[in-house]
Amino acid sequence: ADGSTAFVVHLSDEELSARLIEDFLMKPLRGATEGATVQSAAYAIYRLLRHVCGCTAGTPEHLPAWQEKQLNRRSDAWSRLSEAQRRAVEMWASLDGVTRHAVLPYLSTNPNMNNTAYPDDPSPLYRPGVRYASWLCRWALQLQARVEKLRDGGAASTEQKRRAELLLCVKPCLHQNDAALALQLIPYLLLHLLHHAPDKSASATLAPSLEEMRAVLTHAEQPAAAAAAPPAAAGAGETAASGSLALCCEATFFVLDTLGAWESQQKRADQFREARKLRAFTEAVPRMLLARAALRCGAACRALRYVEQHADETARPTPQEFNLSKGEARRELPADEVALLHAAYGRIDEPDAFVGLGRMRSATSLVEEVRELQHQGRYSAAVSCYQTALQQQQFRQQA
């Protein structure tokens, strides 16, 4: 999304409600979808309009007064409205005209939904072979249960309860496995818990989500170490993760990327305490675990970024004998991390990087030699090395 429509950290309740309605909840109503999916979306729209934004059947009548205000004209009708009524009218005005026409009936109706009780499954929810949409929505529902518990705990302010109500309104849609909505909602659910969970219980509240992400990423690197196994065919690279697992990894990357971007936004707004909480949460997921999972999902550039972040975070103090400027650190990587870099550079066709990596260690593996020879166009030599690697692998299996 561009800057005008992005889901940023500082959206008000009215702005976030409008974007959820426009971008997600209106789709079932505009399409040919029927049954529980439409009912769930309609109920969520009703809850957002009536219970979060305070819209009523009379709200559309105040739209002309809002338009007068936008033209910088004096409006007695606008001045007579309360602050809550003005926020409701502004939210209503922010909706597209087609959307306003479609959701108008929900301002004067009172639909009901059966609140089905779902068990709070233990973490991690991710299991090998799980469907992506099912896993993502169950994760969002797990977070909603914690937000609901925090809201009902008695210590929440009026503003916190209002935001919690917003995040809980779409629960019926998650029961219909709306993965796109769940993916957009999870960062906001985590943000709410990070900012408002009591310090003494924050770790226990957020630990299941960290465990969830680690479970996905750990499974992504299980099927055989990509950098250690011979390529399946020339140029094929390492074995790709399964489609569902790759989607789960991409969702994890999206959540961490979003929270990282929000950390920067909060720093710019001088909200340093909130930014520190976000940073601590995102840094709890090991960078090298992210890098290995990214490489197996085919995201070589992302893998390189994670390795570079890891190198920056673990840079050692500079010994006196190294001729570096004050404040600089010499970055040294273990052999397994250099091997991952080698595999990633091979994916993005960066032959010059192989020269630099070669200077970081005295020997390379046969698999890495195959990769370098392929990039140099020396295919006969690459085939010979590949055959040698296969023979060594067969010998180890026989031994």
Regions found by a protein language model. Give the residues of each.
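Eukaryotic intrinsically disordered, low-complexity segments enriched for acidic and Ser/Thr/Pro residues
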Residues: A1-A399
